[in-house]
From Swiss-Prot:
SUPFAM superfamilies: EF-G C-terminal domain-like, P-loop containing nucleoside triphosphate hydrolases. Its EC number is 3.6.5.n1. Belongs to the TRAFAC class translation factor GTPase superfamily. Classic translation factor GTPase family. LepA subfamily. Residues 5-187 form the tr-type G domain. It is a peripheral membrane protein. Its main location: membrane. GO terms for molecular function: GTP binding; GTPase activity; ribosome binding; translation elongation factor activity. One of its GO terms (cellular component) is plasma membrane. Required for accurate and efficient protein synthesis under certain stress conditions. May act as a fidelity factor of the translation reaction, by catalyzing a one-codon backward translocation of tRNAs on improperly translocated ribosomes. Back-translocation proceeds from a post-translocation (POST) complex to a pre-translocation (PRE) complex, thus giving elongation factor G a second chance to translocate the tRNAs correctly. Binds to ribosomes in a GTP-dependent manner. The lineage of its organism: Bacteria, Pseudomonadati, Spirochaetota, Spirochaetia, Spirochaetales. PROSITE patterns: G_TR_1 (PS00301), G_TR_2 (PS51722). It comes from Borrelia garinii subsp. bavariensis (strain ATCC BAA-2496 / DSM 23469 / PBi). It is found in: Cell inner membrane. It catalyses: GTP + H2O = GDP + phosphate + H(+). This is Elongation factor 4.
Length: 601
């Protein structure tokens, strides 16, 4: 028994801010699954931060019903995916659950770096790709030029491209008809053993983990006992259903369906994205292909500004972890900042989102240390190991070498800004591997560069030197040898562990000078001299001095012997020496924030 041909599963993929969520809004309005009174823009972006930033952080699934012009009724399951490179694994899982993809392209901007990346991802999964030219209502929209890009850059048939304005609802009917016509129906049989792909999950305070899944073969119903094939854990299905903005309960789901199940799972880390679901009494012989553990690539420690709020921060981290399986954390402590957590993130945007959610949703002020990547240490004796923080790096031990992760950076830029972009990449230790002129006005650059070099201001810099026209995407490569050192910051000879950084040796001096200058501006003057130093091991490479507040001890001397004044000044000097020996310099929180949040460093 094969599946009804009236089911269609597709995802919406695009570069950042090309209109995915707005198009999803139009589909929802067209299907009338929510009243006009309850409708709001960015309907699927449930988090406040998503709405404010205009970005999608978590993939969202919706099932709608559409009656086509040929009179047939179609069940359309679509996934609105994130556009940022940090969440590309989430996009790949969404793509794995579909047969078709709508590739959105901004009519005013044309094909961008993430457009190309998502296209290849969909192409590798053998999806039917429908190019969609969005924002045709803009005064600078150039539909003919974008169609040429679709043909020349992507090798797609530009004649099937649908021109729409998701904002104004223009062309939505034509697009829905194209989906019904071109997206293949799901393949598979409900008689085969159950095989379903988990592509997302979220946590419900009352019912536990709600698992989002797509059934490829077989069927599932309430009361079935299931096994997750990679974790080998077994669970009893309490509820199944589909997504219609809210969860809509069903008695049974079968091959081709996209829906959810609830099985009393209390910890979201027990559910692995990409895992295969099967039945215990009639298991599948092999899992679906493509499963891999999602691993953090950026690391930073988070501390509460108020040390008394540590327990509150622990509760906040636990709550965030329930809805974000990709977030990792463990307890950490610093002599300067107190107790906190060492966290792993998918990228810088992921880090910013978590920080903002802690501050907004839990009303906590936090400090994050400088982001770092995972380095591989090759000792002269023993096995290699990984480190994520400066405290784990001991430069004096017998080390054969240090390796750092590299990326393949894909940059698309107008030809007039080519020189500017190449200069930025050179400063970031980039090695050019490819330069392709896409047409007379645009060029595609491929660079191999260290992941650590794009953590701070790389994206901002390429946007700045190209007046906002450059687009950037990257994928992780392997580890390569590097010349790494630990840069320590000392205040009056005491190391401030929270300000230590792992840096490339050639850029250590520049970074040290910048940090010392910033600390000099932020630390209040004392009655004794304060030395701020940047050091690699015992070698000081930068120094700033905060001069002491000086009392005029000779004010009471009116004329007379000069030796009297000298005695008073010598006495003051001796007193300041004693103060320096016993005096602790208090570094204000704003000084840490100034250094840690500064893109210049």
């Amino acid at each position: 028994m094969s599946i009804s041909i009236r089911k269609k599963n597709f995802c919406i993929i695009a570069h950042i801010d090309h209109g995915k969520s707005t198009l999803a809004d139009r589909f929802i309005q067209k299907a009338k699954i929510i009243s006009d009174r309850d409708f709001k823009s960015q309907m699927l972006d449930s988090m406040e931060i998503e709405r404010e930033r205009g970005i999608t952080i978590k993939s969202q699934v919706v099932t709608i019903t559409y009656k086509s012009n040929d009179g047939d009724c179609y069940e359309l399951n679509f996934v609105d995916t994130p556009g940022h490179v940090d969440f590309s694994y989430e996009v790949s899982r969404a793509i794995s659950s579909c047969e078709g993809a709508l590739l959105l392209i901004d009519a005013s901007q044309g094909i961008q770096a993430q457009t190309v990346s998502n296209f290849y991802m969909a192409f590798e999964h053998d999806l039917e790709i429908i190019p969609v030219i969005n924002k045709i209502d803009l005064p600078n929209a150039n539909i003919d030029f974008v169609k040429k890009q679709i043909k020349n850059d992507l090798g797609l048939n530009e004649e099937i491209a649908i021109s729409i304005s998701a904002k104004n609802g223009i062309g939505i009917d034509d697009l829905l008809e194209a989906i019904c016509k071109h997206v293949p129906s799901p393949r598979g049989s409900i008689k085969d053993p159950l095989r379903a792909l988990i592509f997302d999950s979220h946590y419900d305070s009352y019912r536990g983990v709600v698992v989002h899944f797509r059934i490829f073969e077989g069927q599932i119903k309430t009361g079935d006992k299931i096994r997750l094939m990679h974790t080998n854990s077994e669970h009893l299905i309490e509820e199944i259903g589909v997504f219609k903005i809210s969860l809509e309960r069903k008695d049974r789901l079968e091959a081709g369906d996209v829906g959810y199940f609830i099985a009393g799972i209390k910890n979201i880390s027990d559910v692995k994205i990409g895992d295969t679901v099967t039945l215990c009494d009639c298991p599948a012989l092999s899992p679906l292909e493509g499963f891999k553990e999602v691993k953090p690539v950026v690391f930073s420690s988070v501390y509460p500004v108020d040390a008394n709020q540590y327990d509150d921060l622990l509760k906040a981290m636990d709550r965030l972890k329930l809805n974000d399986a990709s977030l990792t954390f463990e307890k950490d402590s610093s002599s300067a900042l107190g107790h906190g957590f060492k966290c792993g993130f998918l990228g810088l945007l992921h880090l910013e989102v978590i920080q903002e959610r802690i501050e907004r949703e839990f009303d906590l002020n936090v400090i994050l240390t400088s982001p770092s990547v995972r380095y591989k240490i090759i000792p002269k004796k023993g096995e290699s190991y990984f480190i994520e923080s400066p405290e784990q790096f001991h430069g004096n031990e017998a080390i054969e070498g240090v390796l750092e992760p590299y990326i393949r950076a894909n940059i698309i830029v107008p030809t007039e800004f080519l020189g500017n972009i190449m200069s930025v990449c050179l400063l970031k230790r980039g090695v050019q591997t490819s330069l392709i002129y896409l047409d007379t006005k645009r060029v595609e650059l491929i660079y191999k560069m260290p992941l650590s070099e794009i953590l701070f201001d790389f994206y901002d810099k390429i946007k700045s030197v190209s007046r906002g026209y450059a687009s950037f995407d990257y994928e992780l490569l392997d580890y390569e040898y590097t010349d790494l050192v630990r840069l320590d910051i000392l205040v009056n000879g005491d190391r401030v562990d929270a300000l230590s950084q792992l840096v490339f040796k050639d850029s250590a001096k520049t970074k040290a000078i910048g940090i010392c200058k910033k600390l000099k501006d932020e630390i209040a003057r004392q009655q004794f001299k304060i030395a701020i130093q940047g050091a690699i091991g015992s070698n000081v490479i930068a120094r700033e001095t905060i001069s002491p507040v000086r009392k005029d001890v000779t004010a009471k001397c009116y004329g007379g012997d000069i030796t009297r004044k000298r005695k008073l000044l010598e006495k003051q000097k001796e007193g300041k020496k004693r103060m320096k020996m016993v005096g602790n310099v208090e570094i204000p929180q704003r000084a840490f924030l100034a250094v840690l949040k500064s893109n210049d460093n």
